[in-house]
């Protein structure tokens, strides 16, 4: 279980899936190192998704490496559908370009199935996702009021391993 504690004290709890094991390992590894602490949800589109995990806060940064895309177009059978509450990895047009940026689906987006590595779902705190999705944004979908992830933590029973990196 991963808990995202927002700056306002509200929480989002995410249960990770075994359907994208390297993607989940990557996320847990970054969480265990405090990578996401203090980062923002830099791209928010109500009725679609909220995206965070960029160290620059712009959507252009990452951890300095990428992982293989664990989804059908990347040659991996991943049965998780991009339904409301699912967490998935953001990437560029390169299927193997995911690093640290992730998104939480705000409303069903099944057109993403097979193209992005879904690796878990929100089990508590969808009202917090809804609140983030409702904030005012600029023309680049950036919240006018920063939506800060104060601390992102793993439950004690989560095993952490380093992910397999491709670049």
Q: Model-flagged regions — what are they?
A:
Residues 1-167:
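Cyclophilin-like peptidyl-prolyl cis-trans isomerases
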